Amino acid sequence: MKKTIRQTIVSAVLASTLLLGGQAMAANFNYQDNPFTLVYANAITKNEAGKVNIHPVKYRVNGITIAANVYTPANFDPNKKYPALTVAHPNGGVKEQVAGLYAQKLAEQDFITIAADAAYQGASGGEPRQTDKPFNRINDIHGMVDFLESFKGVDTNNIGALGICGGGGYTFAAAQSDKRIKAVATVSLFNTGLVRRNGLGDSQISTIQERLQQAAEARTKEAQGNVEYSANADLTKITQADIDKMPTGLYRYGFEYYGKTHYHSNSTPRYTISSLLDLMTFDATDHADLINQPLLMIAGSNADTKYMTDQAMQKATGTADKKEVIIEGASHIETYRKPEYVSQISEALTQFFKAKL
């Protein structure tokens, strides 16, 4: 049974690993061609007077060094006050991908924005690498707020939060307690704890106890210096036929995004198996009623993750100022990159944050 469950876990995670692809895959956006290693359309290539500028920064959260990019609006004057936004990246993603895209888009609308790599991930510090625990991800968002409060030019009474995919779930959770966040928005929310526990679309409920046992065993090994990860496949050997067999659009489109079109060397879906001890007992919506801030939730009509946005919106009973925007025709990953959908989402986010901050 243990072997069967382990194979089930590896197969499921391999699918999610495939959506980040391997280093051998050619990228439409080559992170090495951009001085800030940004991999999205119309990304900043240099700081120029009178335009949106990017500022790589480092700071500490709970003793761990966090790497982040701050975007300042065109003609930024640090002696003036600007509304500001935190932007939390997807699971396995990094600040240079879709989080950077929306951070730049919103900076173009006169917001100061910050996109940070999660602790233990990307260019941020922390060991073991790829530890992926809700407490850390939520504190990453609190830490971004901390940083913004000390950044000259930020109107500390007008800080909002945006999260994408897994970062959306963690932003939704962070806003439940952090009332410094005055407005909350999510794009393609992914409730990581729910999916790690039940599987995407409740496809792994029958193996919950066995996977918890595996996580406990991994914790023991980790304490002895042997870190176990969710997948260790040689992605250079994955074929197109393997990709075509992927069961969901999330994985197929994700492979194209992370593995081909927007590949970044710091991005990986791998996480420590011991992290499941925390992930599988977490749900981003458990205290959704504590959100009393204005709330905007955006999802694609064709996203196989849309049900998570629907559930979170339904549970957010503590705010009367809430709106769900459905992007017709969009899948989960298409909200990261397809120009017409990115434009619609950027417009909705701009209108929301300008009205609420």
Language model features with spans:
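Alpha/beta-hydrolase-fold enzymes
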Residues: 172-256
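The serine-hydrolase catalytic nucleophile loop
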Residues: 92-104, 118, 309
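Short beta-strand element of the alpha/beta-hydrolase
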Residues: 79-90
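Catalytic histidine-centered segment of alpha/beta-hydrolase-like enzymes
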Residues: 330-342
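Alpha/beta-hydrolase active-site loop
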Residues: 131-152
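Conserved alpha/beta-hydrolase
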Residues: 105-125
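Short beta-strand/loop motif that positions the catalytic acidic residue
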Residues: 291, 297-299
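N-terminal cap/lid segment of alpha/beta-hydrolase-fold proteins
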Residues: 31-80
